[in-house]
Regions:
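P-loop NTPase catalytic phosphate-binding loop
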Residues: 21, 29-182
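P-loop NTPase motor module signature
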Residues: 11-14, 27-28, 60
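Conserved P-loop NTPase
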Residues: 1-15
Length: 182
């Protein structure tokens, strides 16, 4: 039977039965699901019923925020999300990182896509002034129907891993207004 089937279907293979891997890493996703890596989209995981990718379309919303307690998996998820956004298929990404003294995010300090990395609060105001200026410029381009100019703009990602930076931001009405206006 096997010999007849092999002769009948020469050069063909059965489709691989999909499975949920023990750990869903970015390298596994790149190898197994390359067709799902698109600009503005990040694969969040696999649907357990269909073993099909579950996608996050960052372009569909304005600001996307993740918060949580330390040691609860937030950092792992955010680092995965960040690495996925740094893939060429996602589009250009620009990082602004406000780290704390533990320097958990120091791997990105000299990354070519990092605009600002600081583990003090010295650059909090500068970062939000710069990002606000860029966002307002994008709104103006959009209002003037210059959508093509917007396509070349990078994604702006701000990572805040500093309770001191959060306290400074929370106490500054100008920065709060900037965030609300994004």
């Amino acid at each position: 039977f096997v010999k007849k089937q092999n002769e009948k279907y020469t050069g063909m293979k059965a489709a691989i039965i999909p499975e949920i891997p023990k750990e869903l890493t970015l390298s596994y996703i790149q190898k197994t699901y390359p067709d799902y890596l698109e600009e503005g989209k990040v694969m969040l995981g696999l649907d357990y019923n269909t073993v099909s990718p579950m996608m996050l379309e960052i372009a569909q919303g304005g600001m996307f925020t993740i918060s949580g307690k330390k040691e609860k998996g937030k950092d792992i998820f955010v680092k995965y999300l960040l690495e996925a956004m740094l893939l060429p298929t996602f589009g250009n990404t620009e990082l602004y990182i406000l780290d704390d003294m533990t320097r958990r995010w120091s791997d990105y300090e000299y990354h070519p896509d990092t605009a600002v990395y600081d583990n003090t609060t010295a650059s909090v105001q500068t970062i939000f002034d710069e990002v606000d200026q860029r966002v307002q410029s994008r709104y103006e381009d959009f209002a003037q129907r210059q959508e093509e100019a917007l396509k070349s703009e990078p994604w702006i990602v701000i990572v805040i891993e500093s309770s001191d930076a959060v306290a400074e931001i929370s106490a500054d009405n100008k920065i709060i207004g900037t965030i609300k206006g994004m």
